[in-house]
Amino acid sequence: MTTVSCDKDENKVDQLGESLSQLRISTRKNNKPSQKKGSLVLSCKKFPHVSVNYVVDKTPKLLTDCKEVHNCSYIINDATLLWNEASRKPRLRPEVCTYIKDSKWENKAVKDSFIGIDLTKGYDDYVPLDRNVLNSLVILKEAYQRYEKTLNPEKTTFVSLRHHIIDIIMCPFLDEPLSLLMTVQPDKNILISVDKSKDKPNGIHETRNSFNKKICYTGFALEDLLIESPTEGHILEHELYYSIVHGSLNDEIDLLIQAEMDSINTLTDTYTEIKSSVHFKLGNTYHRRKLLRMWIQTNLLPKSDLLIGFRNSYSNELEQLKAYKIQDIYHKINNSSIVGKPGKFYKFNPNVANDWFQHIFQVLKQNLLLLSQESTSTTFKVQIDTNLTLSISPASQFVTALG
């Protein structure tokens, strides 16, 4: 399982069907960057976007022409990489696949097997993966080298772990700053990586809040419950599985993304992200934010859906399993009964998130290429604060080139 303000009047869009392409890149003169040698500060607060009350039935796609180009199993104990071995995909249990297909949420066999299980059992003995493994660039760089010749030389390709892309898209919907490293290659492609100087333990790695750690653990426990048990010579206890995805953002920008995958549904040949949650309360800011993040996470892949295990908020026992497609998640957070109410953080509107995604990556591409050296790789610290002010400055940390 992959582990991470604004309250203002918005101008209404004249027509709901107006082309979003007209809104993508801001040309306002009052947003001129302040620039020092090799650095830049630019306000993105007024990024162009649809109204926060904008509702449309069909979910937007974050990437077009999106496809899996490689997959890779990583055996942690001896750092072995096994490329494109489909047999190593972590498979959902057959009864869970059937449960999803039939949509029989009262299925007795499933209820007897899973419902009522304490998802905190085993927490005291659980040792999480090292954060360095989660942020490692080893697989991503090899994937880039394997796929580099097929990249469009006329476009800039951002190369990144998926959780960094999600964090960037989530910036308008959070009240905390973001800091990452971005390395411009001589071929004008851009590698995104963790900024270790700002990287703080969170989730299962949090050291000060044992309650949060235990809640995060329920997600890992749910995965173990729903995925087929390892067999000798097959999936190992410490084996991670990644999908390498290539997609297009617009006519100038592509993305090459490494995404850790929880499981595969063998009946539909679809990746299934497994999440643990209490029952959603859509008036709750945290729940709306969590749903938006889920929508982004699944939307960055060509074939992916969600399986959520709802647990009792007091006992942490599993109460219900429910499958969601991307469209289902979208409708939970983008419908007239929700967006018509007052709210901060752009009302967590996925359409606003899509516009921000388009805008910020275009701004990053233009300015990083402008500031970079032509013949060598150049690494920058890229920060986005809670007011959506973008800062780009030379980085003191060294990131090796992709090639």
Swiss-Prot record:
Cofactor, how bound (note): Divalent metal cation.
Pfam hit, one: RAI1
Source organism: Kluyveromyces lactis (strain ATCC 8585 / CBS 2359 / DSM 70799 / NBRC 1267 / NRRL Y-1140 / WM37) (Yeast)
GO cellular component: a single term: nucleus
E.C. no: 3.6.1.-, 3.1.13.-
Major location category of this protein: cytoplasm
Phenotypic consequence of residue 161 to W: Reduced decapping activity without affecting the exonuclease activity. Reduced decapping and exonuclease activities
Chaperone recorded as keyword: no
Listed PANTHER family: DECAPPING AND EXORIBONUCLEASE PROTEIN 1, DOM-3 RELATED
Entry protein name: Decapping and exoribonuclease protein 1
GO molecular function annotation: 5'-3' exonuclease activity; metal ion binding; mRNA 5'-diphosphatase activity; nucleotide binding; RNA binding; RNA NAD+-cap (NAD+-forming) hydrolase activity
Taxon lineage: Eukaryota, Fungi, Dikarya, Ascomycota, Saccharomycotina
